[in-house]
């Protein structure tokens, strides 16, 4: 066990060192002229102010929960909760700061060409990715080492590492607040800016005359960068912890090694992801997306070859009971190695499937663009249809992965497949954080009045960034589905371990009631999220209209808008609106568990997983398709910018924005928090 912890801690430190080195390389690049630096400073000031206020609010909620967990469960669990929350927040805050510094340098590098701008944008994203996996693995492995150090021989591994559930809960709490609050901010700004700027005033995106333009750029950083970092930090840590707990419960021999085996897989993938980052380079005449995917493919290939010796090392002496038969030695090694391969294959499938439904190169997006030629309503109908259809292939891929992984190594096989999938988080976050960096770089170029040659570089980078953001959301949702299933397995085994053995029979009315309540939660949460964005966007619309009316000279460029007003309004709105929906997944399992019992609570867990998976995929894929349908028309198809088709596509994109960037992604942490809270309260049931 000690070897696994040492390897994980060393690999996590390597990821942090790599982040530090690339931060230095990014900061060494030119930040452009004074106008560019002024815009970047305004974006950074707004993003920092928002995150500080968000973390202050979370801190107040977290302090109350820390005391409750400490008194009701254990102080080790409470300490884990605090550690998970702090590290998750730190990953998001540091990633956001690097993103803001990378934006302006990417815009300046675009003067020199596509390859130079791509290099800085991807490095900025890679820093965030390595911070997420480095801090996540360091936190889990480091806290595990503290928990097992000095323990007496009579203590079981599962009891010793049980406080890690607190770590998972801390990361999850930050995740849902960051995803939801950041999403409300960014889409409130985006929708408000588009409705008045593009639709009413007829000015282009990122035009400095729009009073909401700085708020829009701030939102990209707090939502797409800090929000996604917190989301995948949580998914990464939760999956590793859930697999560790399951291994400690299922294995009778080699329990310690089974508990740290997921940490070793994560450690190997960090090294693989670092190497993969160096393969992201444009070839002469090549595509930007191919350069990014090359890095992902190299990382996946190296991880594949590393997993076999790691499995031999850690699981060679373990035995697992499958269908009443003891399996160990070479057979178990190959079964577990095959399970890791399932996770890597599912990663590739989720990337390919999501790109198909959200890229301008494929029929779904082109279908929405074509539907825009006949009006706003047909655009909305087509987008909703694509979003619904986009659920089929990912869900079938997840189902196939579950079937194969279960046939190989039972529930532990599913957990290992999920761990292998999530072990690629470092380079996946790099692809995602690349998106807001290129988006902001284009905005800075527009606001600073840089030459058209710069926009000719930033625009294709931004178009690819839209697809990478959609792809990583698909990956996050698919992995969240697997992670939630592993957490449900932990819940059932946790009940068994606590001598509360139960069956979840569909003929039991309590289980059915739980399924209905669990199925309701993602819909209720999604509705609250969408309505929150609508209210925030409405306030921005009124403010932008007011400034256009009351500040003469904005439209001719002789006077500047009051950018800070929209930023401050959205900050207050996002903080206010995020609290009640974010507490929903904490309160519902507690209330159901206390008043209806553990069987109904089990139904809640399964119901939330099923409906949450479908809603999240539908929203993120549909929203991404709406966005890129607009971009497809702006590229000169179906009449291009300013045409009736373009106006209809802008409406679709405006509806799709909160779909794909607020409600959809926030459902990921929602379904996992419900499961984690259920795990936490087992002793109280």
From Swiss-Prot:
Pfam families: H_PPase (PF03030). One of its GO terms (cellular component) is plasma membrane. The record marks 469 as: Determinant of potassium independence. InterPro entries: PPase-energised_H-pump. Substrate binds at residues 187, 660. It is a multi-pass membrane protein. Belongs to the H(+)-translocating pyrophosphatase (TC 3.A.10) family. K(+)-insensitive subfamily. NCBIfam families: PRK00733.1-2, PRK00733.2-1, PRK00733.3-5, V_PPase. Homodimer. This is K(+)-insensitive pyrophosphate-energized proton pump. It comes from Nitrosomonas europaea (strain ATCC 19718 / CIP 103999 / KCTC 2705 / NBRC 14298).
């Amino acid at each position: 066990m000690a070897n696994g912890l040492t390897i994980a801690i060393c690999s996590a430190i390597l990821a942090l060192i790599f982040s530090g080195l690339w931060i230095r390389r990014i900061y060494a690049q030119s930040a452009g002229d004074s106008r560019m630096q002024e815009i970047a400073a305004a974006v950074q000031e707004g993003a920092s102010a928002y995150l500080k206020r968000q973390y202050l609010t979370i801190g107040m909620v977290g302090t109350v929960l820390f005391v409750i967990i400490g008194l009701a469960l254990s102080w080790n669990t409470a300490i884990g909760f605090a550690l998970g929350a702090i590290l998750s927040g730190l990953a998001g805050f540091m990633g956001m700061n690097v993103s803001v510094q990378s934006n302006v340098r990417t815009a300046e590098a675009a003067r020199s060409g596509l390859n130079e701008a791509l290099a800085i944008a991807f490095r900025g994203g890679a820093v965030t990715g390595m911070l997420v996996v480095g801090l996540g693995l360091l936190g889990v492995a480091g806290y595990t080492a503290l928990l097992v150090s000095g323990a007496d021989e009579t203590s079981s591994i599962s009891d010793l590492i049980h406080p890690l559930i607190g770590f998972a809960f801390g990361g999850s709490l930050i995740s849902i607040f960051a995803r939801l609050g950041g999403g409300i901010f960014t889409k409130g700004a985006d929708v408000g800016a588009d409705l008045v700027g593009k639709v009413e005033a007829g000015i282009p995106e990122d035009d400095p005359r729009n009073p909401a333009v700085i708020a829009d750029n701030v939102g990209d950083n707090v939502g797409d960068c800090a929000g996604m970092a917190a989301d995948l930090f949580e998914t990464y840590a939760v999956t590793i912890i859930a697999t560790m707990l399951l291994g400690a419960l299922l294995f009778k021999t080699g329990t310690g090694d089974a508990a740290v085996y997921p940490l070793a897989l994560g450690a190997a993938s960090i090294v693989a992801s670092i190497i993969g980052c160096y393969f992201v380079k444009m070839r002469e005449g090549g595509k930007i997306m191919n350069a990014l995917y090359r890095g992902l493919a190299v990382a996946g290939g190296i991880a594949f070859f590393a997993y076999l010796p790691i499995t031999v090392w850690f699981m060679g002496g373990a035995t697992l009971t499958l269908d009443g038969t003891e399996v160990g030695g070479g057979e178990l090694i190959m079964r577990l190695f095959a399970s890791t391969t399932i996770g890597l294959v599912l990663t590739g499938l989720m990337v390919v499937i999501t790109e198909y439904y959200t890229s301008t190169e494929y029929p779904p997006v082109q279908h929405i663009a074509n539907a825009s030629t006949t009006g706003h309503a047909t655009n909305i109908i087509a987008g909703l249809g694509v979003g619904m259809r986009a659920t089929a292939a990912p869900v079938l891929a997840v189902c196939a992965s579950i079937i194969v992984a279960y046939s190989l190594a039972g529930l532990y096989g599913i957990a290992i497949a999920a761990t292998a999938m999530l072990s690629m988080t470092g380079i996946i976050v790099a692809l995602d954080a690349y998106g807001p960096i290129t988006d902001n770089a284009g905005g800075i170029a527009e606001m600073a009045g840089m030459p058209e040659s710069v926009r000719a570089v930033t625009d294709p980078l931004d178009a690819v960034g839209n697809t990478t953001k959609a792809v990583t959301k698909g990956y996050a949702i698919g992995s969240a589905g697997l992670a939630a299933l592993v957490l449900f397995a932990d819940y059932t085994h946790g009940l068994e371990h606590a001598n509360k053995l139960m069956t979840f029979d569909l003929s039991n009315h309590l289980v059915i009631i739980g399924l209905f309540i669990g199925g309701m939660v993602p819909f209720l949460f999604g509705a609250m999220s969408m309505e929150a964005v609508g209210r925030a966007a409405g306030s921005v619309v009124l403010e932008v209209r007011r400034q256009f009316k009351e500040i003469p000279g904005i439209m001719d460029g002789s006077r500047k808008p009051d950018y800070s007003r929209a930023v401050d309004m959205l900050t207050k709105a996002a903080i206010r609106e995020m609290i009640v929906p974010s507490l929903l997944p904490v309160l519902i399992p507690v209330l159901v568990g206390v008043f209806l019992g553990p069987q109904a609570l089990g139904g809640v867990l399964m119901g939330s997983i099923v409906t949450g998976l479908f809603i999240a995929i539908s929203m993120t894929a549909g929203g991404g398709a709406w966005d890129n349908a607009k971009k497809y028309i702006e590229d000169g198809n179906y009449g291009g910018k300013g045409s009736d088709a373009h106006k209809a596509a802008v409406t679709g994109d405006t509806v799709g924005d909160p779909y794909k960037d607020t409600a959809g992604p926030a459902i990921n942490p929602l379904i996992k928090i419900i499961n984690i809270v259920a795990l936490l309260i087992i002793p109280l049931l």
